[in-house]
Structures are given as C-alpha cells and as structure tokens.
A protein has these predicted regions:
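Helix-start/capping segments and mature chain N-termini
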Residues: 1-65, 69-76, 102-187
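Short, acidic/charged, Gly/Pro-enriched secondary-structure junctions
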Residues: 70-99, 116
C-alpha cells in the first residue's frame, strides 16, 4: 500500500494502472532506474535522474521532466513512505495511443515513481557468497542497440539468465558481452 507518483499525480498503490495496449507492454519501450534509499537519502540520486533522461534519449523516449523535477518527485515519494530504507523505481514509457506498430512517436511518454521496502538483492548470499552460473546468453553489441541505456527491453536477457541460474541452484548468472568478456550479473 501507499502511493505512486504517476504523470503528475499521487495515485494509491492499488490504483496505479496502465492500459493493456500500452506500447511498452508490447515492444519494451520503457526506461528505468532502480535506486537504493537509506535513512531517507537516495544513493547518488541525481546521477540516477540524469541517467534516466539519457536512457530516454538513447531509446527515443523523450522524458517530459528535467533531472531537477525528477529529484523533487523522488523526494516526495520517499517523504510519504512508511520507512526510510527503500528501493526507488523511476520509470518512463511509451503509453497507449494511435501507434500500436513498432513506431510510437504519437504515443505519450508517461512516467511514474514508486518506492517500497526491498531487502538485499542476494539475501543471505551477501554474507555467505553467491554461487554463480555462466549464462549462455550474451550482452548485445553496442552496434545492435543502445546497450548503455537502462531499458526494460534489454532486461529480458537478464530475466532469461536469472531463470537459467535458478534452475541450476545458483544465486545468479554472470553474463559475458558479445566479445566473450565479463559484462555483468543480472541484477
């Protein structure tokens, strides 16, 4: 429960909804930031806000807010939360509209910011060590897609890699880039 900021309004958590024909649902046209907040302070908050805007530019999802405006929105969400140690998710996406094909310039870019309590990503593994799988999936070449954007569509590689790891009893997968060099884990 609580509130999510959506398109300029605070919306009750359970009422924050998007249409089934939202472009992002069909084509992955969204960008986001996942941020940790400790004691009411978001770690490297402005850097995240700037990266969100940059990701939007790279993915042709022009975010209709400045980094400073996003900072105020995130601060408001953190202030009304019931706890001060949070995970903050800022998300921008192409909404529903007249374009349901791949191109979506006429669909409004929407934005939301939510915050919730979310423990350590690896749980107890941060104390015991994590068992890692080497994923069969590779991070794409930067000539394929703007892979430096934090874009939802790119995260399907992470989802597949994480599922692969869990099916083998591992905490996570380590992914290589298109050249065979270590790139990242899924989270």
């Amino acid at each position: 429960d609580g509130y999510i900021w959506m398109d300029g309004n605070l919306v009750e958590w359970r009422n924050a909804k998007v249409h089934i024909l939202t472009h992002a649902m069909h084509y992955g046209s969204s960008v986001f930031e996942g941020e940790r907040c400790y004691g009411g302070k978001i770690f490297k908050s402005m850097e995240h806000s700037k990266r969100l805007i940059q990701s939007g530019k790279l993915m042709d999802i022009p975010i209709p807010y400045t980094a400073e405006e996003i900072e105020k929105i995130k601060s408001k969400i953190v202030d009304i939360a019931e706890t001060s140690d949070l995970y903050v998710r800022a998300l921008a996406w192409r909404g529903s509209g007249t374009d349901m094909g791949v191109a979506s310039e006429n669909n409004k870019v929407r934005m939301a910011v939510a915050a919730w309590e979310w423990g350590a990503y690896y749980g107890d593994a941060k104390f015991k060590g994590a068992k890692l799988n080497i994923s069969r999936w590779k991070r794409p070449s930067p000539e394929t897609i703007p892979c430096f954007a934090k874009a939802a569509g790119l995260y399907m590689i992470c989802t597949q890699s994480k599922h692969e790891a869990q099916s083998k009893g591992c905490s996570d997968s380590l992914m290589m880039d298109y050249r065979g060099y270590v790139a990242e884990a899924t989270g």
